[in-house]
Curated annotation (Swiss-Prot):
Native source organism of the sequence: Ruegeria pomeroyi (strain ATCC 700808 / DSM 15171 / DSS-3) (Silicibacter pomeroyi)
Protein family according to the UniProt entry: Belongs to the KAE1 / TsaD family.
UniProt name for this protein: tRNA N6-adenosine threonylcarbamoyltransferase
Task of the protein: Required for the formation of a threonylcarbamoyl group on adenosine at position 37 (t(6)A37) in tRNAs that read codons beginning with adenine. Is involved in the transfer of the threonylcarbamoyl moiety of threonylcarbamoyl-AMP (TC-AMP) to the N6 group of A37, together with TsaE and TsaB. TsaD likely plays a direct catalytic role in this reaction.
Gene: tsaD
Bridged cysteine pairs (disulfide): none
Cross-referenced NCBIfam families: gcp_kae1 (TIGR00329), T6A_TsaD_YgjD (TIGR03723)
GO molecular function: iron ion binding; N(6)-L-threonylcarbamoyladenine synthase activity
Biological classification of the source: Bacteria, Pseudomonadati, Pseudomonadota, Alphaproteobacteria, Rhodobacterales
Amino acid sequence: MAQTLTILGLESSCDDTAAAVVRQTEGQAAEILSSVVHGQADLHSAYGGVVPEIAARAHAEKLDICVRQALTEAGVSLTDLDAVAVTAGPGLIGGVMSGVMCAKGIAAATGLPLIGVNHLAGHALTPRLTDQIAYPYLMLLVSGGHCQYLIAHGPEQFSRLGGTIDDAPGEAFDKTARLLGLPQPGGPSVEGEARQGDPKRFRFPRPLLDRPDCDLSFSGLKTALMRMRDQLVGEKGGLTRQDRADLCAGFQAAVVDTLAEKTRRALTLYLDEAPAEPVVAVAGGVAANAAIRAALETVCAEAGARFTAPPLRLCTDNAAMIAYAGLERFRSGARDGLDLTARPRWPLDQSSPAMLGSGKKGAKA
């Protein structure tokens, strides 16, 4: 008889406090029974970025509320659960610790198994939650603190093909927004301005395209935009609305072109493994960018691979992905004890050397 599992997931690695309940009967599609997210944008907006101490306090205040709301919306109680899963890293350590302590409390009080989940694995496994794709698949994980190409072979088996050696794309979008006086988060703000701009007016560099590997770099792109902004301000005394839109359009075009070309290279390496049904998936907050999605769809179509991306609400940080990743670990027999520790850094591919740089979620795992 097929086993049905119901998992509570907790997420608190950056500036979103989240809880969710996911249920799956073996061999069938998983179902998100509830997904609650309490954001902190209003707490950090005055500082131009996430303040770790403020984030940690907010997580501690909101986690219990999120858990109760998630259970209520799912129509379940703690006795209906099979396990509790929690992000144990990588991330801002204060927030990760808040989530781990909350999950430990639930596990200790109820006797439920505790499952520690790598936040990046949560993103990487989201396409299996939403589209039931089979292993192995090529994953582009592109977010505020991370950017890497992975081949997913199993819930805990990932091979990294390459990644960013400095800023992640999400950081570059955020910094671009700050340079141009746009609101945070920067991704939606820059994308919105870019729709009104001319991407050909300003030609920004496409970093590392002269190298044949799958590594990326975005810090030089940010610097080039800052210099162009300063030049315009020096010449005209300020930026017009059209200047700002054209700068955003040129910046976004450079990011899109870079990701498209590096994806072609990663796809070639992935196809060398001769997967029966080649699939390319993209996840993470920056995956919500429509221009990036469209470019990746074109690259996949050219190579005869299926392209998939989760719904926008599951691209950004959420606990449904943590619950599902925990569910996959639970099915494979994984369990963690009450000695589970929070980890600020936690690479998915333990066999690869650490990436350079350190984003808002820690090292470029």
